[in-house]
């Protein structure tokens, strides 16, 4: 499932996990399944962790692509979290079998798509530069590349 953004000539898309039809509104809801095994006992699973920002951008992008393809898509998407509870009192692995209990959480998310087109145009501009831009200090790829290209601080 993808679309070509003509202004930037960038093809954007991905594989949807699921689409639910709201029979009352006729709108489609994008659903993304996530499976993890975190220490969440007694905690509610949320989208607040910094590393989950990518999940939100992914959902925004799915909604944007589906709308460009002419579908009536709700701004509300859902993350269905299946969290393996291997840290609880339940025995995970024993002599006869292995059993994992799962905590299921359905998390609604209000998408925002207004950032997508400006970002695609910025990507196009970046790809057209004669020299690559510097990495942000927060960019894990830039940190990795600098360590690989300059091990132990050697010049």
Question: Residue spans of the language-model regions?
Answer:
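Catalytic cores of nuclease domains that cleave nucleic-acid phosphodiester backbones
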Residues: 1-44, 73
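A residue-level signal for conserved active-site and pocket-lining positions in enzyme catalytic cores
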Residues: 18, 62, 142
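Long, contiguous hydrophobic alpha-helical segments, chiefly transmembrane helices and signal peptides
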Residues: 33, 59-61, 77
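Short histidine-centered catalytic/ligand-binding loop motif
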Residues: 39-53, 102-107
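Short, charged/polar micro-motifs that form catalytic or ligand-binding hotspots
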Residues: 48-56, 129-132
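An active-site-proximal "capping" alpha-helix that borders the catalytic cofactor pocket
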Residues: 54-67
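Metal-dependent nuclease catalytic regions and adjoining charged, substrate-binding loops involved
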Residues: 65-155
């Amino acid at each position: 499932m993808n679309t070509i953004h003509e202004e930037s000539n960038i093809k954007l898309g991905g594989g949807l996990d699921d689409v639910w039809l709201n029979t009352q509104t006729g709108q489609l809801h994008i659903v993304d399944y996530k499976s993890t095994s975190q220490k969440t006992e007694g905690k509610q699973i949320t989208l607040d962790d910094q590393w989950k920002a990518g999940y939100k951008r992914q959902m925004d992008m799915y909604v944007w692509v589906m709308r460009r393809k002419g579908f009536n898509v709700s701004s509300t998407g859902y993350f269905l979290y299946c969290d393996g509870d291997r840290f609880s009192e339940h025995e995970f692995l024993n002599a006869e079998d292995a059993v994992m209990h799962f905590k299921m959480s359905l998390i609604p998310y209000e998408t925002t798509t207004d950032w997508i087109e400006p970002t695609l145009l910025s990507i196009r501009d970046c790809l057209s530069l004669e020299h690559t831009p510097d990495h942000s200090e927060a960019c894990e790829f830039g940190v990795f590349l600098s360590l690989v290209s300059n091990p132990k601080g050697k010049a």
